[in-house]
Amino acid sequence: VVAAGCYVQTKGDEAKCDEAIDILIGNNQKKELVERLDAFFAGRGEKVEAVVDINHEKQAFEELTLDHAAEHTRAFIKVQDGCNQFCSYCIIPYARGRVRSRNVQNVLEEVKRLAASGYQEVVLTGIHLSSYGIDCGESLLHLIQMVHQVEGIRRIRLGSLEPRIVTETFAEELAKMEKICPHF
């Protein structure tokens, strides 16, 4: 049994004690799943743990790229993870860690691969998409403008946005891009 993601990240001690769980994988180690499964079977069933405290260690964006998704024309591309808001009612910053933005070039490479595979629409997503770039000096608007230039992509959608990012300038710039699906 594999336990992965937010549960392990926020309830790691509880998960470690659960006899039914064989492999623990935190939110920033999902790419290591196959490696951890191999280690589990090579270790003759000994528990395998891959969890780091994502709130106290600087973490890079975990690249999980997509080349195709069944027989669809729309692809979801995660460009941001984590949150720095620490709202009193929310566990996300503890479960997902601080804001981490994906490198613009890596996003563009994935979008180009998807377009070459026949995808016509991309949805840019993130845990707190409005915070894209605050950790690396980029902006969500710049990323959207770059994705807009990719040949073969006909529609661009945005995951949920927080209202604070939707300034008059932001809305005006989006309105100039014919590939942006109407959100406002």
Task: For every predicted segment, state its role.
Residues 1-131, 169, 184:
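Proteins enriched for Cys/Gly/acidic motifs involved in redox and nucleic-acid/cofactor modification
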Residues 1, 10-11, 116-184:
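Conserved SAM/AdoMet-binding glycine-rich loop
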